[in-house]
Amino acid sequence: MNTYKKEGTIKGELVVDGDLILTGNLIVEKWIDVKGSIDCAGYSIKSGGFIKSGGFIKSGGFIKAGDSIKAGYSIEAGGFIKAGDSIEAGGFIKAGDSSGISAGLYITAKETVSCGLKVFAGIGLWREITDAEKTITCSKLEKGNVAYGLLKETGITPS
C-alpha cells in the first residue's frame, strides 16, 4: 500500500488509495476517503463532508467533519472529535483529556469510548432525532460523561 503526504487546504475532495500522513494541518472542502489509515502526525484534520478511513484515524489535534467520521479501526484525537452526522469506529474512539466528542447523530465503537470531558450524541438541529439516532454504543464508556444521548454499553470485549 502506498503512503501519501498532504497538508494545507484542498478545494474539492481528497481520495487516497493507500495511507495518508499529514505534514501540517489539513482542511478539505468536500470529503476525505482513504483506503488505508490516516496519521495526522500531531496535526488537525477538517473536512466539509465526511472523513472515512479503512484503518485508523489518529490526530494530535482535532478531528472535525461536516458529515460523518468513520474508521475501520480506531479514531483518536489529542483534541476534540466532532461530526455533523455519525461517528463510527471498528475499534475504540478516544478524544483528548481536555476535550469531548460531539455528533449530530449516533456514536458507535466496537471497543471503548473515552474523553476528558463530555460526550454528545444526537444533537442534530435539522430534524427530530430518534432515540436510536442519539445512542452511544460501545463496549464501555471508559472516561468522560454523557451530556446528551443514550448510553448503551455492550460489555463485549473484542478478541
Where are these regions (language model features)?
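Intrinsically disordered, low-complexity terminal regions
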Residues: 1-33, 37-47, 62, 68, ...
